[in-house]
Amino acid sequence: MESVEKKDSLTAPSEFATTASTDAANAPTTFPVEAPPLEEEEVIIEQDPGFVSEDDEDRSVPTEDKKQDQDNAEANEEQVGRGDERHGDYLDVGDDVLLKHLQRQCAIICDALQERSDVPLAIADVSLAYERHLFSPRVPPKRQENGTCEPNPRLNFYPVFAVPEVLATYHIFFQNCKIPLSCRANRSRADKQLALRQGAVIPDIASLNEVPKIFEGLGRDEKRAANALQQENSENESHSGVLVELEGDNARLAVLKRSIEVTHFAYPALNLPPKVMSTVMSELIVRRAQPLERDANLQEQTEEGLPAVGDEQLARWLQTREPADLEERRKLMMAAVLVTVELECMQRFFADPEMQRKLEETLHYTFRQGYVRQACKISNVELCNLVSYLGILHENRLGQNVLHSTLKGEARRDYVRDCVYLFLCYTWQTAMGVWQQCLEECNLKELQKLLKQNLKDLWTAFNERSVAAHLADIIFPERLLKTLQQGLPDFTSQSMLQNFRNFILERSGILPATCCALPSDFVPIKYRECPPPLWGHCYLLQLANYLAYHSDIMEDVSGDGLLECHCRCNLCTPHRSLVCNSQLLNESQIIGTFELQGPSPDEKSAAPGLKLTPGLWTSAYLRKFVPEDYHAHEIRFYEDQSRPPNAELTACVITQGHILGQLQAINKARQEFLLRKGRGVYLDPQSGEELNPIPPPPQPYQQQPRALASQDGTQKEAAAAAATHGRGGILGQSGRGGFGRGGGGHDGRLGEPRRGSFRGRRGVRRNTVTLGRIPLAGAPEIGNRFQHGYNLRSSGAAGTARSPTQP
């Protein structure tokens, strides 16, 4: 038993256990044997008789019975073999392959439980250890040559459409609030108010001093729909939900408001890390109360629950003892800590020009827009399949990035705006999660020291914005800001954003399958119509609208030809646009057409050469960025400007124009040579047209003999007359129906030859056959695939035949 216990493991059943169970099931007869009594200390684990080891079998069964059992087993195997021949199962070859799945899963669970000293008994503990082992391993996954992580087969055993709790360290938190009546869904003109034109600037944040009054009503401009549904059991005819049917609602909102009745919504949490906010509140506003211990003295005086700054100290700092002034300063400080500092940190994180460029580049991948679409087309590699999380790159071919192109007008703008809004929420939550996880107790103590040193400056600042700016300098230092900006944002797909959207709606009690709600529908579009706890969402919605217009993904401006991947944003036009940058267009046309080889340093080794491959060009094309013509904080499209670009338009790899021109001339000359001297038909790779069509064969010069020329007029008259009698009516036709077998000349006179005059002159006969040849309908003009020039379709009188060569 001891040897068996050491040999077995938790990963899979042993080999002899599997075969023993199979043999026991297939054995036709069994013989009772009296096994010797086992000692008590040896009987530790009650074991299934189907999994008895071979050593125990040898010790317990006598030798004579053992031989008989062996003979029976051999006979049984022969019988089973004959049965398998009749009823074969390809899964029984060798070991049972159906056990491999169980073995692999046991191995994964065993590896996940190695870090624990005891085996967990609760399902929640096993799931937590399993998720940590899969999604938060101590050893990061290996990086492949293409930059992505190696495939992880352990993920095959995790539920496909389940959201792992280990990953959702910050994304699972929500802010459950009452939906304001002034939300975007109750503003029928919201799409027009959010429309941005040339010259629009990036949105700014606000403070409670700047917005003293907040209106959360429906407004005078909005009118209820005449056919709005009314509740039957309501005396005042009021709608129980927040969403109101309006006259100007689009089709999506009209259906939404009749489908659901909601009053509250789970907004994604945008708060600063709880560790930071708890420290700030305790040092600036009110002392945090600690939980009471059993041996604590209740009579002992503590500062828990008291203001961080007393009235006496605040009066000395402000040099006034007016209670109204002191109360106003406390309100200002509370607003700055709870609302404005969060907006200040958001603006510093998102409004940075470098960060905005990275955001818009990620959106180009998410929506397969502009230069990313052009790179995918030339490289023949779907770059939009790349997604990342916390700097780890993955390739996911199941995500979609083009479904927004099926929408038009306001429906497309609402969807794109909501996707960008969710993308910003997702990015900010990821940053806050990293910030929260990195903080240790020593960092929080150092933060307390900094807050105490700047306590007077914070309380005596000029206004709310200055307090928030000073506080942001302390809690959100430049080093932390740059570190988060370098690692974010992550590459996302529209499928990931759709899963995030469904996750939010489900937490809000809205079933996504029965309605067409968007999380941005429940966010107000203006600060003066939004409660202060939701100002962070209002800012992200305005910023999402600006980024969507600045990235030119609101409308589809692409076309045919060179305009297939056209985008007006500053990332694409003019430097990455094949329409505006002629040097870039010329370089893209010579990809894979040349190879430059320099002199070799020695005779044995070959010299390094330059070959413009699609991969090399795409890498340089994706890296190409000109900051001089990128206007981050203003919508300034190149097409709407009369001035030339600030930087010179150049190619990606070959930046010298004369070299590029020489390579293009060489390539053009080679193509022309192939068109002239090459064999076969060359087709244009874009349009499919023939580049070297074979010209039609020249018509031979028709020189009639004098004898025939003199008879030309008589021939035409005779042809018309002969046609009515069933005889041939033009050159080359037999004169059937003439006078005797020898008749049937051109004019029907006796004694003339049947096929033209002068029987011995072959040239005239050849000219007669060649006259009026046209190619077959639908056949190429090559070879001798011609027919005689007779129009067989009825035109005019029936039974007449006219040559196309005749007028």
UniProtKB/Swiss-Prot annotation:
Ranges of compositional bias, category Gly residues: 726-743
Cellular component per GO, a single term: viral procapsid
Residue span of region Disordered: 1-88, 684-807
Induction conditions: Expressed in the late phase of the viral replicative cycle.
Residue stretches of biased makeup (Polar residues): 16-29
Modification Phosphotyrosine occurs at: 365, 682
Biased composition (Basic residues): 756-765
InterPro entries referenced in this protein's UniProt entry, alphabetically: L4
Alphabetical keyword list: Chaperone, Eukaryotic host gene expression shutoff by virus, Eukaryotic host translation shutoff by virus, Host cytoplasm, Host gene expression shutoff by virus, Host-virus interaction, Inhibition of eukaryotic host translation factors by virus, Late protein, Methylation, Phosphoprotein, RNA-binding, Translational shunt, Transport
Name by which UniProt lists this protein: Shutoff protein
Native organism: Human adenovirus C serotype 5
Name of the coding gene: L4
